[in-house]
Amino acid sequence: LEYNPCEGISAKGGKPTQKKDSLTDQQVEVLLETVKGLPPYLFTMIGLYAGLRREEALALQWDCVFLDAPTPYISVRRAWRSEHNRPVISTTLKTKAARRDIPIPKCLVNCLREAKAASKSEYVIADSEGQPLSYSQFKRVWQYIVVRSTKERTYYKYVNGQSIKYTVQPSLGGHQKNNPNIVYSLDFDVTPHLLRHTYITNLLYAGVDPKTVQYLAGHENSKTTMDIYARVKYNKPEQLFDVVNSAFHQAVPS
């Protein structure tokens, strides 16, 4: 052999990567209805309709949001990171491919225009003092979504000096006991990355070619885009019928 076919292979085991489905159109509608008027709304809209990574959205400044251009777009030029719970904004992006200009749909244009009119900060998503969010501030913002989920919760209470574990399973449409204004309206998991994954998936469903999706998503490796593309393209048996039928078009011997 002129090369070692096992080179680079690790003997270490590991858990398989968990494949996450994107949000359905109905779930997106429910999510947006749930967070409308709440702190995570703008971040959610940017994730769903521009596909920005969390570090890109939290670093986004108004000088990179072009709402009045013939084709409105967002320029990704900065990245956020947290150091000792302090936000650090840098022009060093995750990869070279992360630097990109993303056309944005009308719904996001309108959302950003409204946010800009009310903003006193150079940052699109900012705290009460106009500064970028710290890690703990972002977690508190995202908690508005978490507390409205029907996901099972566990907590501990001290009873007679002992720590007792309790499990609570909220029911869809129910109200939080301590805060009746909070309605359990989300019976599906939502993460910041899932917003971006939904954006990418919807582009592929709409027939946008994978190379263009790779650019819009800021994927340096085309494999990342193509893995999603394969799942989107071949996720339903009825969509595979013609492919399989063509591959085995020969008549079966009687």
What are these regions (language model features)?
Residues L1-E2, E114:
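Arg/Lys-rich amphipathic alpha helix in sigma70-family domain 2
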Residues E2-L60, P70, A97-A98:
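Basic, Lys/Arg- and aromatic-enriched nucleic-acid-binding interface segment
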Residues E7-G8, T71-V76, I125, T191, ...:
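Short functional hotspots where side chains directly engage DNA or cofactors
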Residues G8-G13, Q26-Q27, L60-A115:
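Conserved tyrosine-mediated DNA breakage-rejoining catalytic core shared by Y-recombinases
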Residues S10, T24, L32, R77, ...:
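Residue-level detector of conserved, well-ordered beta-strand and adjacent loop positions
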Residues E29, E33-L38, A50, I102, ...:
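Short, basic (Lys/Arg/His-rich) helix/loop patches that form interaction surfaces
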Residues V30-T34, N85-S90, A206, D227, ...:
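DNA/chromatin major-groove-contacting recognition/catalytic segments
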Residues A69-P70, H84-R99, K106-L108, S128-E129, ...:
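C-terminal secondary-structure termini that scaffold catalytic or DNA-interacting sites
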